[in-house]
């Protein structure tokens, strides 16, 4: 059973893209292991050339300096029934066939509905013009590029790295030294969650899991 952040190779996206699709790729954020090192934040910025002011993943400390202090890495969770996808009035947000949530920046109108709908606060709206799109939503792509031509200059500019198409995992999970971030094939990631929960005697530490993947 996988016990690290290196799960089995990502399944290729097959079949049509659509409004919703089952989550075949998942994130597991283990708050019992996060040490707030910031490695995921730096790796994401470097891998995707994310400009200043944008954080596709961020580490938040809850109850800092108090009993029960908890560190939480917050990416886009690419939810099974993503509320951001449901509320987008122009269908700029959609699920790929593998369940990864993408945004078409040529379609996005910057209305902000997705930000209000997201339980994780993942959507961001830069006031400047990174990626050449003023006010258009940006978020974690699971290092899967975007709807643009894979590996094209346009994809790199608008969406960033496409590690998934290369058979690699998101950079944040790849560099996590404590394996607090686990990413990859849904079944394998779920096995890690179950194993850690069983070892602890509870699901403590499985931040956001039940919200993002309610049937798992």
Regions found by a protein language model. Name each.
Residues 1-216:
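Non-ligating segments of multi-cofactor redox enzymes
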């Amino acid at each position: 059973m996988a016990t690290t952040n290196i799960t089995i190779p990502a399944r290729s996206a097959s079949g049509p893209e659509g409004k919703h699709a089952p989550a075949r790729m998942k994130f597991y954020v283990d708050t019992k292991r996060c040490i707030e090192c910031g490695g995921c934040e730096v790796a994401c910025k470097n891998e995707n050339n994310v400009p200043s002011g944008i954080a596709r993943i961020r580490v938040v400390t809850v109850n800092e300096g108090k009993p029960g202090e908890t560190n939480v890495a917050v990416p886009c969770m690419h939810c099974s029934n993503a509320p951001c996808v449901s509320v987008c009035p122009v269908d700029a947000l959609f699920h790929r066939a593998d369940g990864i949530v993408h945004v078409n920046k040529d379609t996005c109108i910057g209305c902000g509905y997705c930000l209000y709908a997201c339980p994780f606060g993942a959507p961001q709206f830069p006031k400047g013009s990174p990626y050449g799109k003023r006010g258009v939503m940006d978020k974690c792509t699971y290092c899967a590029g975007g709807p643009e031509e894979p590996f094209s200059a346009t994809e790199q500019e608008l969406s960033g790295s496409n590690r998934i198409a290369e058979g690699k995992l998101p950079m944040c999970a790849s560099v996590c030294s404590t394996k607090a971030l686990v990413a990859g094939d849904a079944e394998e990631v779920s096995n890690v969650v179950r194993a850690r929960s069983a070892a602890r005697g509870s699901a403590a530490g499985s931040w956001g899991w039940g919200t993002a993947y309610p049937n798992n």
